Amino acid sequence: MDDDHEQLVEELEAVEAIYPDLLSKKQEDGSIIVVKVPQHEYMTLQISFPTHYPSEEAPNVIEVGVCTSLAKRDLYDTKYLQHLFQEVMDSVFHRGSVCLFDFLTELDGVLYVEPEEETEPVQQSDIPTDPFEGWTASDPITDRGSTFMAFAAHVTSEEQAFAMLDLLKTDSKMRKANHVMSAWRIKQDGSAATYQDSDDDGETAAGSRMLHLITIMDVWNVIVVVARWFGGAHIGPDRFKHINSTAREAVVRAGFDS
C-alpha cells in the first residue's frame, strides 16, 4: 500500500468514527465514496479521490443529491452546488494533507441558513460612535510581515454585533486590513433563540475556526474580530495559529473566560 492510499484509508476510518452512518464506499478501495453532509443529511455527495491524493491532487465532488420533498428539491440547483462544493474542496486542500474533515466542516457554514425571526430594533443608544468603544484588544502578533490583532466585545443581539463591527471597520487602520474576520455567539435573555455564525472575509476557514474556538470556550453574547494586515509573504497554516491565539487573548481579556 503506497503512502497516499494509506493516508486515504486512515482518513476515511477517522471520518467514519466521527460521523457514523454518514459515509459509505462506492468503490471497495475507497477511491469513490458517498457521504451525507453532517447537520444537513438530506444532501449527499459523491466524492472521488485521485491516485495522488493527498500528495498532489484534491478530491473531486462528482455528484450532489438532495433527498427531500419534491417541492423543496426544486429549490436546489445541484449543478451549482457541485461547482460551489468543489470550490470549497479546493480551498481547504493543501498538498500533502488530507482535507475531508475540514471540507465537511466548511460545508456546514456554507449550507447554514439562519431562521427568520422578528427582532426588536437596536436602540440608537446601544451603538457607540467611537469605532473602538466597547471593544477589548489583544496584543498584535507579527510574523513574516503579516500582523494579526483581535478585538472582542459584549453584545446582546446580532443587530448590535453587526453595528459595532461596521463601525469598527470605519477606523482608518482597520480599513487597510486585508481581512477582517469575525465570529459571534448570542443567546437572548428570556428566549430559546441563539445566534451563532462567522465571516471569513476572504480568509477561507478562518471564521469557522474562530467560531469553533468560542464554542469550546463556552462563551455567549460575544463577537470576536481578527484583523490581518498582509505583509507580502505567505505564511501557510501558521496564520490560523495566530488568528486563534489573538482571538482567544481578546476574549479572555474582555472577561468572558474568567
Curated annotation (Swiss-Prot):
Limits of the RWD domain: 10-114
Residue(s) of cross-link: Glycyl lysine isopeptide (Lys-Gly) (interchain with G-Cter in ubiquitin): K187
GO biological process entries: cellular response to amino acid starvation; GCN2-mediated signaling; negative regulation of kinase activity; negative regulation of protein phosphorylation; negative regulation of protein-containing complex assembly; regulation of translational initiation
A cellular-component GO term for this protein: cytoplasm
InterPro entries noted in UniProt: Impact, Impact_N, Impact_N_sf, Ribosomal_Su5_D2-typ_SF, RWD_dom, UBQ-conjugating_enzyme/RWD, UPF0029_Impact_CS
Gene Ontology MF term list: actin monomer binding; protein kinase inhibitor activity; ribosome binding
Keywords from the UniProt entry: Actin-binding, Cytoplasm, Isopeptide bond, Nucleus, Repressor, Stress response, Translation regulation, Ubl conjugation
Impact when changing E106A: Decreases interaction with GCN1, but not with ACT1, and prevents inhibition of GCN2 activity in amino acid-starved cells
Subcellular localization(s) per the UniProt record: Cytoplasm; Nucleus
Pfam families in UniProt: RWD, UPF0029
Classification via CDD domains: RWD_ScYIH1-like
Chief place of localization: cytoplasm
Assembly mode: Interacts (via N-terminus) with GCN1 (via C-terminus); this interaction reduces the GCN1-GCN20 complex formation and prevents the interaction of GCN1 with GCN2 protein kinase and GCN2 activation in amino acid-starved cells. Interacts (via C-terminus) with ACT1; this interaction occurs in a GCN1-independent manner. Interacts with RPL39; this interaction occurs in a GCN1-independent manner. Associates (via middle region) with ribosomes; this association occurs in a GCN1-independent manner and persists under amino acid starvation conditions.
General remark: Present with 3030 molecules/cell in log phase SD medium.
Protein function: Translational regulator that ensures constant high levels of translation under amino acid starvation. Plays a role as a negative regulator of the GCN2 kinase activity; impairs GCN1-mediated GCN2 activation, and hence GCN2-mediated eIF-2-alpha phosphorylation in amino acid-starved cells and subsequent down-regulation of protein synthesis. In normal conditions, it resides in a actin complex and has no activity.
Family of the protein in this entry: Belongs to the IMPACT family.
Protein's UniProt name: Protein IMPACT homolog
Lineage, highest ranks first: Eukaryota, Fungi, Dikarya, Ascomycota, Saccharomycotina
Gene that encodes it: YIH1
